Amino acid sequence: MTTYQILLKDFNRNNTNVGYFIKIADNNYTFFCRWNRYCDCAFLTIEDSDRKAVISSIALVNGLRIRHNKIPYVINFKQIYGETYEPTIDNIAKEFAFFYDIEDET
């Protein structure tokens, strides 16, 4: 099994709205992350290659599992070292990531 990691680089106090173009199993997606100061957390929207929302405005909390029939794998959002604290605007880009596993062909 191979684990893939998608880091949230460039997401910080000066850049609170970011988009990442990601290819998963020959499908193109755009992950939009937006920090909400009122809630003090990030929200995620995922669009497919046709710019249709697959996932819309879910809070990025540690341990989040994203499962959808338009995404071929379960995507987990978590702290990269397995810690249990929640992301902040100061640590989200350095310490949190999306992860998904693909079975290796034998």
Q: Predicted regions: what is each one?
A:
Residues 77-106:
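C-terminal low-complexity, charged extensions that often adopt amphipathic alpha-helices
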Residues 35-83:
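Acidic, aromatic-enriched beta-alpha/helix-loop junctions
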Residues 1-32:
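Short, charged/polar N-terminal "headpieces" of proteins
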Residues 24-40, 89-90:
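Short, surface-exposed loop and linker segments with low hydrophobicity and enrichment for Pro/Ser/Thr
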